[in-house]
Amino acid sequence: MADTAFYTHGLFLKHKMGNNNPECPKRLEKIEELMLAAGTSQFVDQKTPPMVAVTDMLAAHDADYISYLSHNSPKEGLNTISVDTAMNPYTWEAAQYAAGAACAGVDDVLSGQYKKVFCAVRPPGHHAHRDHSGGFCFLNNVAIGALHAIGVYGLKRVAVVDFDVHHGDGTSNILGGRDDVLILDGFQEALFPYAHIHHAPPNAIYTPFPEGTEGIALRRTMDEVWMPKLKEYRPELIMVSAGFDAHREEDQAQLLMVERDYAFL
């Protein structure tokens, strides 16, 4: 058995928000293509996630919001949920499997079955707030997983690391202010979601990078800020919102990370 589990589901490829949307099935297709080409597929156990439990959803999101998503799932076509976020007939079910992957991954690690887990899921989650969607996100997968670890296993110190080019505003909305969570969030400043990035919750460290920042700056932040804080915090579990859109070839952002920077992370 491998020491890494890899979660994905066929429904993740069926969730679509219209033509030319950057959050598209090709994101996951490319991951699996590259894993096969590099030969890394043989070193992971591929698993299908369960659907998230209602209790886990309600730990992170308001009941009215969950009901709203359920009742607004369309039978055909697209239903716009917020200015940039829409559902097709597969979205709601896919979102529940995506959050279920986060919880199953937590179970796998905390039970000792695996050392680490990668969840290749769609829709993403870190812009989903307690009571509303946004930024292509419906359920906050990492927040649901973190609260699952706390609620089910009694963890006292969970670290959430977010290196997506966009600030994880939804994650801070749900987990901000908790004594049992540490949030480390590095992102491009003056970019969506244009949040109040200079007013971090007491349990969060925000590291905004100006346009044109190269990967060496993020590496330095990891060495000089994040790693000392993690060592001081002594997390029982580390969860990562692993967005790779700070890459220099990303059209919708202006950071300049390259492959070796992500390998370092």
Please place each PLM-identified region on the residue numbering:
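HDAC/HDAC-like amidohydrolase catalytic core signature
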Residues: 1-161, 165-265
